[in-house]
From Swiss-Prot:
It catalyses: orotidine 5'-phosphate + diphosphate = orotate + 5-phospho-alpha-D-ribose 1-diphosphate. Belongs to the purine/pyrimidine phosphoribosyltransferase family. PyrE subfamily. Keywords: Glycosyltransferase, Magnesium, Pyrimidine biosynthesis, Transferase. Homodimer. Coiled coil: none annotated. This is Orotate phosphoribosyltransferase.
Amino acid sequence: MSKSASRARLLEIIRRRSFGRGEVTLASGRKSDFYFNLKPTMMDPEGATLLAELTYEALKDEGFDYIGGLEMGAVPLAGAIAQISWIKGHPIAAFFVRKKPKEHGAKLAIEGLTRDETLAGKRIVVVEDVTTTGGSAMKAVETLREAGANVSLVFTMVDREEGAAETFAAAGLPFRALYKAREFL
């Protein structure tokens, strides 16, 4: 399937499985009359594959060492993208950032790394399923920067176009999206 056909097919899947109308309160606290819940698309075999392939194709030539983001939305994305990257012969390792470090066990804020593995100095792309203001992704960025990571890009599946670009620009971060909310409205 061509890139444009894959993109059109994924848009259909997101529209059917993950887009809805009706008043909701977003993670940002804002009210909206439409919403995206990408989890049904991320858990669908075709949807997960298309999300991973299209994201991998958008990122493969940029030299990222790791891909990940804030739990929960980034977990299935990062895992699927890492798998596709291995299959395509250009592996990008995955991780995720906990909203709050575990209070037991290793008490980690960043999961997916071995004990002797570090993100310090590594080129990182932070991925997110849906971005509104950018606040959730910035939590991951802050944790990663504290760990010494070089966060080089924030990449979202759907940008609601409600301030995220400005948030990331103010933090000196490039921001890209697979889709814009207006494509579904």
